[in-house]
Amino acid sequence: MNTPTTTSVIIIDDHPLFRKGVSQLIALNDQLHLIGEASSGEEGLELARALEPDLILLDLNMKGMSGIETLRALRDADLAARILILTVSDAADDLVAAIRAGADGYLLKDMEPEELLARIVEAMRGRIVISESL
């Protein structure tokens, strides 16, 4: 069981290497606890319903169910999780679509690892987090 100061996290991303890197990064922060990984939106939705994480890191561009479709489904499932989009897309339209669909943040995958961890902590404090380069 997680203590109140620990944030449970799942990663939904179709790239195994990226999931592995982010999971190793999360392991470096005592406040974060990775409880699951999914390689598709469909799998991620199932996992989120079953595990009810505090935070979901969600890729935008995935095969099958897109990140926006997954985000909408997660919000429709009435999960309390904070959801951060973690993507390579710096397109303004994608950012706007994600925020409108209920994202709590929009972060670019090219950010420094320490910055990503700092933004995750900010998001868990209730802030909307968006990459500075946007």
Task: Identify the meaning behind each predicted range.
Residues 5-18, 22-26:
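Conserved acidic segment of CheY-like receiver
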Residues 13, 59, 87:
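Active-site residues of response regulator receiver
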Residues 31-39, 47:
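Short hydrophobic/Thr-rich beta-strand motif most characteristic of the beta2 strand and flanking loop
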Residues 40-43, 65-69:
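Acidic catalytic/metal-coordinating carboxylates
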Residues 46, 68-79:
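Short amphipathic alpha-helix used as the core "switch/output" element in two-component signaling
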Residues 51-57:
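Active-site beta3 strand of CheY-like receiver
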Residues 62:
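Receiver (REC) domain active-site loop signature in two-component systems and cognate sites
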Residues 93-100, 105-134:
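Short, flexible helix-to-coil linker/hinge segments that flank and couple to helix-turn-helix
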